[in-house]
Amino acid sequence: MAASVSRAICVQKPGSKCTRDREATSFARRSVAAPRPPHAKAAGVIRSDSGAGRGQHCSPLRAVVDAAPIQTTKKRVFHFGKGKSEGNKTMKELLGGKGANLAEMASIGLSVPPGFTVSTEACQQYQDAGCALPAGLWAEIVDGLQWVEEYMGATLGDPQRPLLLSVRSGAAVSMPGMMDTVLNLGLNDEVAAGLAAKSGERFAYDSFRRFLDMFGNVVMDIPRSLFEEKLEHMKESKGLKNDTDLTASDLKELVGQYKEVYLSAKGEPFPSDPKKQLELAVLAVFNSWESPRAKKYRSINQITGLRGTAVNVQCMVFGNMGNTSGTGVLFTRNPNTGEKKLYGEFLVNAQGEDVVAGIRTPEDLDAMKNLMPQAYDELVENCNILESHYKEMQDIEFTVQENRLWMLQCRTGKRTGKSAVKIAVDMVNEGLVEPRSAIKMVEPGHLDQLLHPQFENPSAYKDQVIATGLPASPGAAVGQVVFTAEDAEAWHSQGKAAILVRAETSPEDVGGMHAAVGILTERGGMTSHAAVVARWWGKCCVSGCSGIRVNDAEKLVTIGSHVLREGEWLSLNGSTGEVILGKQPLSPPALSGDLGTFMAWVDDVRKLKVLANADTPDDALTARNNGAQGIGLCRTEHMFFASDERIKAVRQMIMAPTLELRQQALDRLLTYQRSDFEGIFRAMDGLPVTIRLLDHPSYEFLPEGNIEDIVSELCAETGANQEDALARIEKLSEVNPMLGFRGCRLGISYPELTEMQARAIFEAAIAMTNQGVQVFPEIMVPLVGTPQELGHQVTLIRQVAEKVFANVGKTIGYKVGTMIEIPRAALVADEIAEQAEFFSFGTNDLTQMTFGYSRDDVGKFIPVHLAQGILQHDPFEVLDQRGVGELVKFATERGRKARPNLKVGICGEHGGEPSSVAFFAKAGLDFVSCSPFRVPIARLAAAQVLV
């Protein structure tokens, strides 16, 4: 934050005519070309090893093209200074975000240190020219420099009237990984001596040694450690701890040592010509655009179509020129609470580095109010101007030099979820923005924070972090360690908070997962069973924590040097993946009345409906409370794991050697299923409920363990003999179960299974209708690949409906549709739509089958693919729009051609991921369905695509 406070500063001659209201004599480009810099005669190229460390695409830092300046028809250098600018906030594509905002602040009359921005188009021309400055550009840069010199009454390289500069990159989109800032450019021995005569030796030579460090590292790629070694050795030899304790004499000596480091590393002396320094810095910024880290950042974030980076050259101002100077950072509103009050820090007689290094503790802004009342009043006025102008909370950096305020930067301020919602609502109430604009001010991640518990003070536990895994499900959890699902349920029944620690979870663990306050797994990715189920329930989860070793037998987990046994306290941060020792204090979800107001605006705008994935009445109620417009996916197989009695009935059905015995088990399951459906219909009174028929492979209902234990348990539960049980297990075993005997294939082979589930749905719907509940059941057939498969199941379902309706003498409306999760189904969607009244894309399996990735095994290679830029996102987290997305669009278009009123949506994990939701909205889908806890996030994403 404060590191950049010192970036934009200027040294002015005491008593100079550089007053607040000073304006340039001319903003127009001069028709006479600026003189060529003296070093331009030095031919050719600076050695390519100057950029080797950053792996720059344009490795040589070339000298200025030795040619007469050529007039260009397109402007490439834009000036800015108080009251007048050649750019504005709308020119981010050309000036970069930083340059556009500097120009905007200057144009509305704020005191901005003057400077100029070299456009992104110039960077593009530089790249196109094979990393050589385009003809005429250097003359334009020198022209811009002369404008700044006239504005400030100071000259680059003049010891009597020294002008120092900062040089910074700035693309249209904020891009960490670009070139760092170069400060104090323009210093050499003569200028440092002149500066020392005016402002003191210590200040001058501290600035010089900082410049040598930054220029050497940032521009010439000399390892910073080489400079730091000299600094540390100097402090040790003097018995000092802090940089500020060094004397002027010490700093002078360091300057000499830093020059020796430069000479040794580059084989040539440090360039003393200030214009040569400026040239090399500009080239370094241009080259940084093609650095590996910048290209990787653009690839990962899908940033395309940009011309390059702009170069911002700005005069320096200093906050460390005595007790009438200082530096600070502030937010125009509290970024934690949203309160309309300035929130920030200020340091007297300091530069930003002092804050970053922790050398001094910053003071509240009230300190500035007391010490520099005139500058403070101007700062408050500027904050009000900027908020009204940008219509957003601003993050502002400023410096006061000898009682004069300089605005260094403004940008939209980062904030917490609670603050984001309050600021959006307050600004509408203040008449500053309209509701549609306010919707854009809150990020989906902000709502995620509001819907989960958080730690009171994350910085307080940093020394207690003992491992870090994947942040699989956000929020915070504090509980006592348990190692089995049964123990988690038992502890929960006793009113204890349990953290379930497993090597990995399975469907049989769902009871314990639901009972636990948090889940920690040794293995598994962001789409593992633990992660997916945790997100459905809004449970905090840290998965794939390779730094832990779980020992179920002894009920202990080893985390580094720590061994935790059952009952010991552990805390999890599901938003960061941190595993924290002990019992850390929690604060409840920060829900407020502002959130309801904000979400009402969201719902007024969006067209895409948002439903929820819910398997129990409690889930359904949570979904409804979070604004779900129905249930888009109710997984019937999850109901079977709800109790020992249910799982035994399922196993009896699986093991039954005859239809008669299988039907007996199904009759028991009918009672359970009917009761569950009644509860869900009741909770969703008046809203549609989509129930998916059994999808799990049969083997997932079998006990875990070695074959002898499985056989023994099955025999005890079902009455089968060991030989029959073993034969049945062998028959159920599959080489690739996720592509095997599951979904509609179960219902086709065992039609009585589909009949039981359909009967439970219709009987529950009739019972609830008789109680005055409005019921809209929709039955979804899973894993369909051909229209014949769907036709088989639809016929069975409609036959059951007719029988149930005839028995009770009453009918209800219902729909039968299918999941589109097999690529073939998407390709023949028109044929399938003849049988289906709705499509719901199961994007989890559709992604799995389209990529040929096993979801259970992607953790072995996806991280490598992401690290190498082969994939930009994990396709199980963020929809693959080019591949899977095209299948979604194709199937939707084909399906609606065959059935124009076809309802289409999705019910995979992507239904709660903001960029995926935006894609589905643009693709014309009718709904998305997601975890109950992500419903507000999907609602917001669906609205933001329209504003």
From Swiss-Prot:
Its EC number is 2.7.9.1. Substrate binds at R635, R692, E821, G842, T843, N844, D845. Changing G525 to A/P: Greatly reduced activity. Strongly reduced or lack of phosphorylation by PDRP1 in vitro. Induction: Isoform C4ppdkZm1 is light-inducible. Changing S528C: No effect on activity or phosphorylation by PDRP1 in vitro. Isoform C4PPDKZM1 mainly localized in mesophyll cells and only a low level is found in bundle sheath cells. Isoform CYPPDKZM1 expressed in roots, stems and etiolated leaves. One of its GO terms (molecular function) is kinase activity. GO terms for cellular component: chloroplast. Pathway: Photosynthesis; C4 acid pathway. One of its GO terms (biological process) is photosynthesis. Residues 21-54 are annotated as: Disordered. Homotetramer. The reaction takes place in three steps, mediated by a phosphocarrier histidine residue located on the surface of the central domain. The two first partial reactions are catalyzed at an active site located on the N-terminal domain, and the third partial reaction is catalyzed at an active site located on the C-terminal domain. For catalytic turnover, the central domain swivels from the concave surface of the N-terminal domain to that of the C-terminal domain. This is Pyruvate, phosphate dikinase 1, chloroplastic.
